Amino acid sequence: EALMKIADAFTPTVDIVCGDCLWIDAERNLQYIRKSKMQLKKLKYEMVLMHPTCFVRRTAYEKWGYFDINLRYIMDKDLMARFYSRGANFEYTPNVIVSMSAGGASDANAKKVFEEGIIVATRNGVPRGIAVFRGKYKGIRLKLIKGIKNQKKLWGFLYTLKSKRN
């Protein structure tokens, strides 16, 4: 069913289709839906798309390049930022496309993610000072969120409030 939804969104002018992700955190016994935020201008700063839900036409890779294998932690963010900055056409389908568990490579080494984030941001025209500031801000924000997630009841309550606003 998920593949049919992706196929329906792929009109001839669309290069990339993204959807939503069922995020599973087995350690904290949590499940919630993470939506791809189609705030594409932010791609040069942060990954606003749920990368496992992104389906890319082969022609997009041929036009704008492949993953930069010199990056280890945020090559997906680099790729999507590059595609966007070079004119790729993104489409969003408001459906859960994949289920994903917490604990990927980018969760394991915040310092390396920060360093690569500066590289990707500056490649996409962000001044280095702004890239560093935004990276530090995001690091503090993620620590706060992680602390809240450790408090299951509070996280469930806050997530319920957020869901009601959307």
Regions found by a protein language model. Give the residues of each.
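Conserved donor NDP-sugar-binding/catalytic core segment of glycosyltransferases
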Residues: 1-31
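Short, surface-exposed helix-loop/turn micro-motifs enriched in polar/charged residues
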Residues: 5, 71, 129-132
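A short, hydrophobic/aromatic-rich structural module that often spans a beta strand
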Residues: 6, 73, 149-150
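Alpha-helical structural signal in soluble globular domains
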Residues: 9, 120-124
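A short coil-to-beta-strand element that immediately follows conserved catalytic motifs
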Residues: 16-17, 91-95, 130-132
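Low-complexity, flexible helical/coil segments
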Residues: 23-29, 50-57, 125-138
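Conserved nucleotide-sugar donor-binding catalytic segment
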Residues: 25-26, 32-120
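Membrane-proximal basic amphipathic "stem/tether" segments
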Residues: 125-166
